[in-house]
Amino acid sequence: MKNEKGKPKKERKMELKSGLSRREFIVGTTAGFVTLSLGDLLLPSLGKAATPKKGGKLVYAGSYKNSKHKSAKKAKHPYYGIEIRTKNTYNQLTWVDENLNVVPEVATAWEANAGQDVWEVTIREDIQFHDGRPLTVEDVVASYNLHKDPKLGTSFAKKLVDKVEKIGPSKVRFFLKTPNSEFAWNMAEYRQGIMPAAPLEEMGLSGIGSGPFKFAKVDVGRRVIYEANEKYWGKGPYLDTLECVNLPGMDPLNGYLSGQFDVLASVDPSLIGQLQKTPKTAIDIAVAGDQILMVLPKYEGSPFMDKRIRQALSLALDREAVIRIVYGGKAGWASNDSHMAATNEDFLSKKPLRDVKKAKQLLAEAGYPNGITLPTFYYAPYVPEITSVLSVAAESVKAAGITMKIEERPMAGYRKWRVEDKEKTRKHRFAMGPVGPRNPAMNLFRMARPTYNESGYWHPGAEGDRYIALYKKAMRTGDPMARRKIYHEMQRLLQEEVPAIFLTGRRETIAFRSDVHGLKAHPQHWSLRFTEVWKS
């Protein structure tokens, strides 16, 4: 499949029960996403074209600390930096843009064989690393030998890439372990930076990449300072210095209001109203963002063994109330009980979104005519608004006779605590998991993978196994329209079986000072770029 530029999207009106006006929401017919008009988001001065000004320093509050960041030795490595936003210093073969489309970066073109398991990638020949060395095919091969290494590598490449080889001065060939018709998106993953060739155990430690900024200073666990890469191959950078602050227990909002920060890289939606009233402040809201996943463990004695109870819980949840109350009708979106992001062209809306009468009927059929009390639902504060989201959700299901107690757990060790242990002495818990927006193949694979078992033991089993078979078929299918039909079938299966519930999605929101230009919110918080950002 060759890369193609996206075609302009048409717009159509979308009716919502939240009472929002036509002007407040528009939705792309092909993408299915909701976006605010620019007039609602940006200060009037920011909408005008201006010539970028070079120089200056920008400080932003880091929002998602990298749990693997622990030592000075590895602090510049793309796997172990202070944050998972590696785009400042490293380039990947591709980039996923603000509309979740895959676009060229180090790679200029890519093409798969008919079986979708061999990909040939052409790379740019005008890129230099920070130390002046040219970026070559040999560096791409060496980088992916690291990424796919069983002990040293990163999960996406380890599971997918079998072999990588040079086939020309500007061409590399990937042999995949299994077919993947959307491999171009995998090449954009944030850890899969291209680094100078070296022994695998040494690669990445120097921090030398080909990105728009270079490492200047790292304060482990607290902050990192970057300086402009004057040899950058693309547009920009315009800033002289970029600083990310990620202090333990810091208050980003107070830091912003006191002048510490120029940018809040991830905003609590409850603060949008306050920030809109803050002088010389602009807000940008991405087309999508993370979802809140409810894992429904299915084992002997669990109420979720009964599909009717899973269906009832999904139908009882008032997702529109969450969007209206927590996200102000603007910074949230309705999930469809799959990992799919609503921005994607292959997204299949859930209909009906809520049906309390049907939920009560299903509970009665399952033997609970007077309602049901579910096990405690656990969560950790992955996003600032999570308690508010779950409080509204727990209140909403009472209308169907469902009682659901919620309990917050500390972030430290949460994922290990909520999943089954290696000895299988503990089952997966009825708990929340975060889900980032990616392409359909990555999104839908997560309900098929055994890791962390987000499907809650849905497979092995007839419908779960059928789902996996459909996924494998989609990965062998090169034609996007034929693949869409398969994706729709997979989503219909998920909406019928409800192996997991996706409560709602948030739209990644950033706030910044009005003298900051060229900055756009990104649905993947790890893909936010400062390459073309400048200060007036």
Which residues are covered by each model-predicted region?
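Structural transition elements
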Residues: E300, A331-E365, P381-V389
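Extracytoplasmic/peripheral linker and loop segments enriched in polar/acidic and small residues
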Residues: D162, A399, T403-R415, N443-S514, ...
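Long beta-strand-rich cores associated with HINT superfamily self-processing modules
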Residues: F512-S536
